[in-house]
Amino acid sequence: MSQQKTMSAGLLISALGVVYGDIGTSPLYALKETFAGHHPIPVTPENIFGVLSLVFWTVLLLVTVKYVIIIMRADNHGEGGSLALLALVTELTKGYRVHYPLMMLGVIAAALFYGDSMITPAISVLSAVEGLEVVTPNFKPYVVPITAVVLTGLFFIQKRGTGLVGMMFGPVMMAWFGVLAVLGVVNILAEPHVLAAINPLYAADFIIKHPLMSFFALGSVVLAVTGGEALYTDMGHFGRPPIRIAWFGLVLPALLLNYFGQGALLIGDPTAIQNPFFRMGPEWMVVPMVVLATCATVIASQAVISGAFSVARQAIQLGLLPRMTIIHTSGDEEGQIYVPFTNWTLYVAVMALVIGFQSSSNLAAAYGIAVTGTMMIDTILVAFVMALMWRWPLALVIAVAGTLLLVDLAFFTANAIKVAQGGWFPVFIGIVSFTVLTTWRRGRELVRNQIKKLAVPLDVVMRALGPDVARARGTAIFLTAATDGVPPALLHNLKHNQTVHQRVVLATVMTTEAPYVPDTERIVLTELGNGFYRLLIRYGFMQTPDIPAALAACKPLGLEFNMMSTSFFLSRETYVPSLNPGMAMWRERLFTFMTLNATRATIFFKIPTDRVVELGTQLEI
């Protein structure tokens, strides 16, 4: 076997473990919730055929056509996901009136993602452990405690990294999809006519004859495609080919076979609706299936947690969240990170959901809103990619995006009516997250504007550097968000100490709209004269800044740094409300609170703490 084929096989197996955990565990609860959820549907052959047809065409349209075929083409330099798509679209729409509304839509998608990332671990592991109730109802009191123990273990190992355990994810998920397919085939052979539900006329007939019932059914059918957006989100890790091959070659057939197998089981035994997945095999298989299902749901949860870490880093780099501690858990993979604040926030929320909702059925009502909302926003954003990047004819854009948007809207509306039954949770988390993201973004914008107002032109400072101003030995690096003028920290140093270093570097760390900036394009150095330099350090939104490494990269450009003779000057800003505040008072207080609790710049930028001087600055915002 060639190295290329070995690598491809490895990528395929890895993709199974990371990309498909969420959608792969949907058979545990999707059909069960459709027929026995908050809006139960009578388990009749006619309804089973109608629902199966809806599931089949929903998976094909929303996952296969929308994500695998269309949206996965809209990569941002190889990266996918809502924030990567947002960065791409905001770049494409600069100068257009829709620029700001689209940016806000992307922020809403990121906010909804956090609601989704809290619900997925809870509902997935609960649904797996609930299989024990099929063995004996006596296990019911232990479902929540077992789920809590499993999830607690998962969150506590995050800080150690999951590289070693992650090697098992792919093989476990391959076994999982194999079991899904085999169980499906065995049950289909007992009722082979169930395959007729592939015909979309069954779905159409179900909708026409039972409009209200079918509307409620949509709210649960969408559970079959939760996790479909992960195919696009994880594209940066594996690339398009492995994800598409795994989808068409194993995941899609296994999922559809299992759903049709569950349908066949229900035709023969309608009482199996209480937990059709675990009734698909013989009794002796239930416990092994529970173990395998628990492993699969833990893997699905891990993928969501890792995704939350990645989104947090992207949001920080794109200026939507304050600095947080980011720990790299692998020396080889830049994408393997651990964000403590995100981890423990998710843990508290997940535990609250498990204890508060008690069952996967109760949680199912909360699940759909975040997913359908995100999918709807992805459709809107990719429509602009179709028009502005791919240059599709307007009629084609309207036809394709309009059709997908109508489908998304139908599913979103069907889930919106479940607000009282649990849908309030992702809505609440979405509102809180959106408020935090937009408040931080607006606050930083106000701070930048104020710093620009206070900044003194560089030529004025240069003229002020007369013979009476002492020049200290060594190098002073002033970190500043502005790419012109002189930062407040330098002015304070000059005012109070009457001295300037022999070399002064005005350094700005900039995040681009691209996920990665190659090392060769990282540094832009400009000599300003009289020992002054302006240094622009560029990173992608998927990268973590490292100031010492960036300074070392300046050596080939003629600027070498000795850390023992280099001092870093940082501004420590305190904020007071102005007479005409740029935000509501409560948002200014929230912004100040986030600033006070943000990770210190020295830690975030990896600056040696013994070489740092902080100078206080008071700003009105």
UniProtKB/Swiss-Prot annotation:
Q: Which GO terms describe its molecular function?
A: potassium ion transmembrane transporter activity; symporter activity
Q: Which residues cross the membrane?
A: 11-31, 51-71, 103-123, 137-157, 165-185, 206-226, 247-267, 285-305, 337-357, 369-389, 392-412, 419-439
Major localisation: membrane
Catalytic activity, per the record? Answer: K(+)(in) + H(+)(in) = K(+)(out) + H(+)(out)
Q: Which HAMAP family match?
A: Kup (MF_01522)
State the function annotated in the UniProt record.
Answer: Transport of potassium into the cell. Likely operates as a K(+):H(+) symporter.
The UniProt entry, under PANTHER family, shows:
LOW AFFINITY POTASSIUM TRANSPORT SYSTEM PROTEIN KUP (PTHR30540:SF79), OSMOTIC STRESS POTASSIUM TRANSPORTER (PTHR30540)
Q: What is this protein called?
A: Probable potassium transport system protein Kup 1
Q: Which organism is it from?
A: Rhodopseudomonas palustris (strain BisA53)
Q: What is the lineage of its organism?
A: Bacteria, Pseudomonadati, Pseudomonadota, Alphaproteobacteria, Hyphomicrobiales
